[in-house]
Amino acid sequence: MRTVFVTGTGGAGRTTVATALALAGARRGERVLLLSTEPADALAGTGVAAGAGVPVPAGADVLASAGAGVPVPAEGDAGVPGLTVVRLDSDADFRREFLTFQERADAALDLLGAVPLEDGELTELPGSEQFAMLRALKTAGEGDHDLVVVDLPPVRQAIALLALPEQLRRYLRRLLPVERQAARSLRPVLAQLAGVPMPAQWLYETAARWDAELALVQALVESPDTSVRLVAEPGSAAAGRALRTARLGLGLHGPALDMVIANRILPTGSAEPFLAALSGRQQSAIKEWREEFGGIPVQEVPHAGHDPQEPADLDELIDEPTGRTCDPVPVKGWTVEDRRADDGVLVWRLPLPGAVKDQLQLVRRDDELFVTVGPFRRILPLPSVLRRCTVTGAGLREGELKVRFLPDPGLWPKGR
């Protein structure tokens, strides 16, 4: 299964491009799933989703099916066999998950004298959309689709979402470590010694279930069959900055980038001075992008002059090279180079394309390395061989970070 995350600058046409990519896959005879958190009217504006008129599974209503992430075939008036569109209802997802958790925590709430909240009292909290998408990605990863296209928010929020499974799993391991669960037979004794109730078994079981589900999503994000497609409208300095920021974030968190789409490109050679100048700025920006992104394809999508109203509009908008699911451009892996024989050190090589020294910060804490690049930060567990070493320095050259480690004689096995 191929997975393509579509993101980019705000207002650049991400949803239109994601829908067109999904449609192109369905036209090739693939089984395609399109995931989006965009409102129903925004999806309907792409010409594929039929809004309330989209048929739903028998016995299910539109709200329930969307909130639960049940696939809604985009057929009927749209007439696109093989294409399934799921619009996530993050509000319904939040209420359902909150009530489920509250039910499981009933004993603890009774102990505190709390009055449980009812469904009608709940309103969606910030961040609910991200968790709804994580649950939808887990379900998609367990499906049998040939292609999954995910319509993500603008690039900063998108990269934060892709990094979320790893971050949440780290929090769970720190707050509810498996070692404490293993000592559950001693929990009554520990509770008496501490003078406070110990966490209930259901809490550890819930944490274990969350960790397993997050691991599935993390595996999907880190899969070699997963890539990111960036969408931007050239011509403004802001678009160029956003793409450079995206490159930094994807270099640190992944997945690999497979294509940059320059959207809404005007025809060249216009007799109108204003349009000619705007087209010239677009072409200059595209040239800069191709130089900056190296071997990553930069495909142009022409300005249609109107919003797409039906699938045929998307067919005309997206040509074969832009609509294909090309393989992501290979990136160097994170490797440990053994240079003890020459320099007495081990070197951890971390590719960070687009990174510059004044935006880079490194901090080692115990068995982890905190890497900050621009607005992004990732906490990396050290490979086991480096945990017995001390950091002696680091350098950034040509988009690759090299961190030098000196083996600690007191910890390093003798004879090695």
Name each model feature, range by range.
Residues 5-88, 152-170:
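Walker A/P-loop NTP-binding active-site region of P-loop NTPases
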Residues 39-42, 90-94, 154-157, 177, ...:
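Conserved nucleotide-binding/hydrolysis micro-motifs of P-loop NTPases
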Residues 55, 186, 214-357, 366-370, ...:
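C-terminal lobe/tail of nucleotide-utilizing enzymes
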Residues 92, 169, 409-413:
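Short, charged/polar, Gly/Pro-enriched secondary-structure boundary elements
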Residues 106-244:
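Phosphate/Mg2+-binding loops and adjacent switch elements
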Residues 342, 363-365, 397-399:
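Structural motif
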Residues 386-402:
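Short, surface-exposed loop/turn motifs with a glycine/proline- and acidic-biased composition
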